[in-house]
């Protein structure tokens, strides 16, 4: 089965793609890369701590497999439906985990597919709140 994954580029997001591949499925991965921002020191420390925690959980072979069919796009551009999305739509199932909010034409296209939306928060308003 070809599993499409639309996600971000944090360790927990990469781990999902690695694990699906480890379980024997082909993976087509689109990762959104966030823009570098100037955060306050407290926020920087928080994300360093999250990164370290994820590193301790998602280490080992099944969590760190390189995905051959991997594409990166700038965060927030997914709704402009880049060419990679056409390939994503050919997948047997699509998993959305940690991506930008999906709307417009992309939402319409995805609504005709088998899609699993993994969202840790209680509301899209908390997007990026690292609800884990």
Task: Name each region found by the language model.
Residues 1-132:
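One-carbon transfer enzymes
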């Amino acid at each position: 089965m070809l599993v499409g994954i639309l996600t971000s580029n944090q360790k927990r997001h990469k781990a999902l793609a690695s694990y699906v591949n480890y379980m024997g499925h082909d993976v087509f991965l689109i990762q959104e890369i966030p823009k570098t921002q100037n955060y306050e020191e407290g926020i920087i420390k928080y994300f360093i701590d999250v990164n370290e925690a994820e590193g301790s959980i998602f280490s080992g072979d099944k969590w760190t497999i390189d995905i051959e069919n991997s594409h990166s796009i700038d965060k927030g551009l997914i709704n402009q439906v880049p060419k990679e999305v056409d390939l994503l739509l050919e997948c047997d199932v699509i998993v959305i985990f940690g991506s930008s909010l999906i709307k417009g034409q992309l939402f319409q296209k995805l609504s005709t597919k088998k899609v699993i939306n993994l969202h840790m928060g209680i509301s899209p308003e908390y997007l990026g709140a690292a609800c884990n």
